[in-house]
Structure formats: C-alpha cells, structure tokens
UniProtKB/Swiss-Prot annotation:
Sequence segments annotated as region (Interaction with major capsid protein/MCP): 1-47
Organism the protein comes from: Human herpesvirus 6A (strain Uganda-1102) (HHV-6 variant A)
Gene that encodes the chain: CVC2
HAMAP family cross-referenced by the UniProt entry: HSV_CVC2
Listed name of the protein: Capsid vertex component 2
GO cellular component terms, semicolon-separated: host cell; host cell nucleus; viral capsid
Length: 555
C-alpha cells in the first residue's frame, strides 16, 4: 500500500498555511462611512430627479404657451389670408394694388400689434365699457379728451390736494397745477391720486404669492363649506366663490349677529397692534404678528367657532385647541388649509401658503372680507331705479351716449341685486384679466372714504387704546399727501413704505369704525357726499369703481 500513499495524500506538502486572522475586516466606522456615502449619492439622485421634474414641467408649460401662441398666430394668419383671397376675387384684372388704403388694411399685422379688448359693466342702467389694458387709466384719458368744453369738479377732497401741492413749486410744475381758485384739477394730479388709492392694499416690498382678494375668497369658501347643502365642492374655482358671495355674506351676517348678542364686542373688526406700529409686514420671523393681534377680531372668533381654523400660533384665544391636541394626540383637519390648497393649487401648485404661519395673508384676507361685506351691506340697500338725486352722468366721460332716465317715482323693488351685478360684470372680468388684483385696485373709492373716516377721527396707533368718550386732535396731515409727496420726491424706500402702510392702517381702522354701525350706509354717504360729490347709490357705485366722480361745475 506504500505505493498508493500518494493517491491519498497531497503530492506536495503545503509550506505556508492560511493564518486564522487572514480575513477581510470592516470596522463600524468604515460601515458608517459607506452608509453616509450611499445616502449622499441617493440624496443627489433624488434632488436631480426633482430638478429634472421641475425642468420638464417648466418645459411643458413653455411648450404649451408656445403652442397656443402659434395656434393664435395661425388663426390670425388664416383670417388675413382669407380676407386677401376674398379681395382678389373681386379684383377685375386679378392684381392687387397694395398701396391703396383699403388693400393696406388687408395686410396681416403681427400678433403683437393686434389689440385685445376687455369689457366690464358697472350698473344695469349703462352699457358695457370696453378697454384694452388699464381700465381706470383709459377712463381718465377718455374723460380729459372729451371734457375740453366744460369745467368739472371732483369734490372738496381733491381740491384740498390741489391747494396743498400748489404751494410747493416742484410738485406744482410736475402735476401741472394752475389757477388755484378753480375747482378743476389737472389730469396729472387725478392720475397720481387714483394710483395712490389703487396701491393701498398692494404691498410693495416682498412678492406675495396670492392677493388679498384671493386670500379672502379662500377664507370665505372654507367658512361656507362648514354648512350643510353648501354649493361648493372640489371643482369649485375662485370665480365660483365670487358668484356665491351674496349667499355667503347672508350666513356671515347671521354669525356676526349671533356673536354680537353674546358679547358687546361682537362687532369689533380691528386688530390689537402694538403702539406706534409703523409697518404692515409681520416683525416676528417675518411671518407672525405680535401676540393676540387677532384676539378680539370678530371674524377670527367666528372662524374658530365654526371650526374653519383650528389654531393661531401664540394666540390666547386658541389655548383650548392645545388641550384638545394633548388629549387626542392630534387636531382635526384644518378646513382653511384644505380649501386654500384646493382653490390655489391651479395657480401655485404645491407651494400654497398656510395662513396661520404666513399671517400677513390672513390679515390682508380679513381686510378684504370686511371690504366686500361692507359693500354687500350698502349696495343692496337702495334700488338704482329710484328717482335720482345725484348729478353724475356717464355722458360726462362718454358724450356720445344718450341720457336715458330709467328712474320711476315711488318705485319699490323686491329683490335688489346691485352687489350681485357688480360682482358678476365687473369683479369677475377684472380678476380674469389680472388674477393678482387687490381690493384697492378694484374699489379705490372705498379706500378713499374709509381712510378719510379714520383720519377725520384723528386715529393713530399710539392712541388706539384711548377712551372712546374723548375726541382726538389730528397731529398729521392727509396721509395721501405725504405718500404722494414721498413718491414724487423719490424719497427712501423705507420712508415711502412707512407712508404707504399708514394709509393701510387707516383703511383697517376705517372699516372697523364703519362696520360697527348698524346702518353703515348713512355714515359712508355723509362722508362721500361732503368730499366726493356722491348723492345717491348710482353715484356711489361709480365712485367706488373709478375713485373719482366728475360733476359739471357752474362758473
């Protein structure tokens, strides 16, 4: 068997055997490093995927816009080609003389030169008004182009502005002011003043993702959704909410009346700002106002009571919701967040702000609700078919119109819908034209009346807590004078912003004062009549929309 040993044994004896520690060793530090590198690469891939998705979405949007533009240009070109072909058919010799005026009109124009017209209606008594881009600016131009044969007055408030600026040589030349004794004002002064009225609720510093009107519509939609059989669902748009405003305001009025019966302060529409507050922008992290700023606001109490809002950070009014969160582990779904996302998602995508965190949206939305609610209470209080006592006629701006008297003596209307008509034929077209439009841009006349109501009482932040039985002297001049002067003199941006926010604070206080009255119409009409030539509902509606009311002056 010795010869067979090699069959069972290795022919070569191994010299070096494998060591017991001759293995791959990976420490915990190495494992963590590998995990970190893998996580980093995975994060980079995820971020790259998000970037690619955003780029694809942006590319799709640009391609869709380009496709629509090309389709529009193609339709325009086809229409012009058809017009040229029709002209060629009627030509005897088969040639077209492009130098003639008639044929020159058939030459296709570039899409940039094609005019796009929009139209709105203010009252059911008057025809639609067509304009191109700037409704109010074009109305001012039309008025001054057609008013050369007459002298017009715009009220004592505009005349006082003229007297103030007339005494300053630089502003007098810039605004082209002459003849200080005349009640008429220049086109430049009217345009600058109306622009200041339009910009009252437009915040000029940071780019807001939504306007105050959109914020108000989101809040009202969330409020309306808490009622049974409400005409609102996931397919509802902001335009639909505008058409539902009369129904919503009836419910809102009932809720406010109920709160008024429970508490004497149930009609307080103001904010508890700190003394000497100068700027509208929140000072706490740029998002939150001071503690308990919204504590006494009647709309906040109503929204919390209806379950529309669950909590406002740092507010004493919402401490009971903290208890609920601790007991049940979570707070109920926020109705306001849900409807804000539903209504604003088509415009903003997933970047929809949350009002309880970005509180400037909440505050501006509440002010817009107050403005619309005040209009609803006033405009439907009197029919336009009653016998008129006002002197404004649309022929003052459009002389080609005929004066038609629709008034009836002893007219009784069972269903007045002045507010509904204005929303449907004015607010909706203006919002479709410019979806970031604000309340002051829609109704500059309302800004003028409410601000002057606050200024007349001498209100300021530092005296906001003064006793109600004491009268307050006015320590400052007209805030619009300071704002216009700051703009014309090109003062520092901070100075202009401070004067702009002063107007906004006066607007908030003026709305609070007016809405606290049982009959706000008499209060506003008394102010508008003494300052802006307003004498009836027809005059008031046009003043709300235009921001001025020209009346022929007898020299």
């Amino acid at each position: 068997m010795a010869q067979c040993n090699l069959f069972y044994q290795y022919p070569i004896t191994p010299i070096l055997e494998g060591h017991v520690r001759n293995i791959l060793i990976c420490t915990e530090k190495d494992v963590e490093k590998l995990q970190s590198q893998s996580s980093l690469r995975l994060r980079e891939k995820i971020d790259q995927g998000h970037r690619d998705k955003l780029l694809r979405m942006r590319l799709k949007t640009e391609l869709d816009a380009l496709q629509k533009k090309m389709q529009k240009d193609s339709d325009v070109l086809n229409s012009h080609l058809k017009a040229i072909e029709d002209a060629l058919l009627f030509t005897n010799d088969g040639e077209v003389n492009v130098e003639t005026k008639a044929d020159a009109q058939l030459i296709p124009k570039s899409p940039e030169k094609l005019e796009k017209f929009n139209q709105v209606a203010i009252t059911p008594l008057d025809p639609f008004i067509r304009f191109t881009d700037d409704f109010r600016g074009e109305m001012i131009n039309t008025f001054f182009n057609n008013a050369q044969m007459w002298n017009f007055t715009f009220g004592s408030w505009f005349y006082k502005l003229k007297r103030v600026f007339y005494n300053e040589p630089g502003l007098r030349r810039a605004l082209k002011l002459t003849n200080v004794d005349s009640l008429t004002i220049s086109k430049e002064l009217l345009a600058v003043t109306v622009n200041a009225l339009e910009q009252a609720t437009v915040y000029p510093i940071f780019g807001s993702e939504m306007s105050d009107l959109e914020a108000a519509l989101c809040i009202l939609a969330a409020f309306y959704s808490t009622y049974e059989n409400s005409q609102i669902d996931e397919r509802t748009t902001l335009v639909d909410v505008i058409t539902l405003l009369p129904v919503i305001f009836r419910l809102l009025g009932s809720e406010i009346t109920a709160l008024k019966n429970v508490s004497p302060s149930g009609t307080y529409f103001g904010f508890n700002d700190p003394s000497c507050m100068k700027f509208f922008v929140p000072m706490r992290k740029g998002k939150h106002y001071a503690e308990n700023t919204f504590g006494n606001h009647v709309l906040i109490k109503m929204l919390l009571g209806r379950g529309v809002m669950q909590k406002i950070p740092g507010e004493k009014i919402s401490q009971n919701f903290d208890v609920e969160a601790r007991l049940h582990g979570a707070i109920k779904n926020d109705v306001l967040v849900y409807w804000t996302y539903q209504l604003m998602r088509p415009k903003l995508g997933n970047n929809v702000p949350i009002f309880i965190h970005d509180q400037h949206y909440l505050r501006s939305g509440l002010v817009a609700i107050e403005s619309l609610f005040l209009l609803w209470r006033i405009l439907n209080s009197e029919s336009l078919f009653n016998k008129r006592v006002g002197k404004f006629l649309l022929t003052s701006i459009f002389p080609q119109l005929e004066n038609v008297d629709f008034a009836e003596n002893n007219f009784e209307a069972g269903n007045i819908q002045n507010f509904e008509y204005l929303m449907h034929h004015y607010v909706v077209p203006m919002y479709n034209l410019q979806n970031d439009i604000s309340i002051s841009t829609l109704f500059p006349g309302l800004v003028a009346v409410c601000v002057n109501e606050s200024v007349r009482l001498g209100w300021e932040h530092k005296c906001a807590g003064a006793p109600s039985d004491a009268v307050q002297v006015q320590s400052k001049e007209n805030p619009f004078v300071e704002y216009i002067r700051a703009q014309m003199e090109q003062q520092a941006d901070v100075a202009i912003l401070e004067k702009h926010d002063c107007i906004l604070f006066h607007l908030e206080n003026g709305l609070n004062i007016t809405l606290s009255f049982t009959l706000p119409r008499q209060r506003l009409f008394a102010m508008a009549s003494s300052l802006f030539n307003v004498n009836d509902t027809y005059d008031f509606i046009y003043f709300l929309v235009l921001g001025f009311l020209p009346i022929p002056a007898v020299i």
